[in-house]
């Protein structure tokens, strides 16, 4: 049996992935008491998990350090190459939205400034609309950008909308759905015969729509 190394996004995605794999019949109790460790191996040696930040999941998979990766689609939009996207795991559901202060006019054709942590998503969105905009990359709390006059609007991930409301912003348009995805290293798929049976088991579970985390 060949070991499968999985790069896993730390935090909420990690927690929901453990629930998913438990539902699929895998013993994930070894992940219960993590402490400060970032690398975990199952007692039977079948799996090794690497707990990393979302953007780094694609890096570990692309370079073959991890066979599989579990990461939000928002990250994949910004890092679109070097892996195969296998499954929509149907949890971590949210959306990309265009938001701004109530006085914002999306139909005003003046050149707009758009603040975002996702420049590729924002650029593609406005290109599809045929609008020329200035993209301002923000790494922190993008919600305050329109309030402070740095940007006319923002493109950001929205789950409940509470953060937008708390900062006086409204959603003007939903851009696309986002969820957690399973990705793979192409060489690993070819060389590790245990990966596809594992993927098929997860796909069967997700296909029965039994995955519903809140």
Curated annotation (Swiss-Prot):
The keyword Transport does not apply. PROSITE patterns: ATP_P_PHORIBOSYLTR. NCBIfam families: hisG (TIGR00070). The lineage of its organism: Bacteria, Bacillati, Bacillota, Bacilli, Lactobacillales. The gene is hisG. It comes from Streptococcus gordonii (strain Challis / ATCC 35105 / BCRC 15272 / CH1 / DL1 / V288). It is found in: Cytoplasm. The keyword Cytoplasm applies. Pathway: Amino-acid biosynthesis; L-histidine biosynthesis; L-histidine from 5-phospho-alpha-D-ribose 1-diphosphate: step 1/9. This is ATP phosphoribosyltransferase. GO terms for molecular function: ATP binding; ATP phosphoribosyltransferase activity. Catalyzes the condensation of ATP and 5-phosphoribose 1-diphosphate to form N'-(5'-phosphoribosyl)-ATP (PR-ATP). Has a crucial role in the pathway because the rate of histidine biosynthesis seems to be controlled primarily by regulation of HisG enzymatic activity. Its EC number is 2.4.2.17.
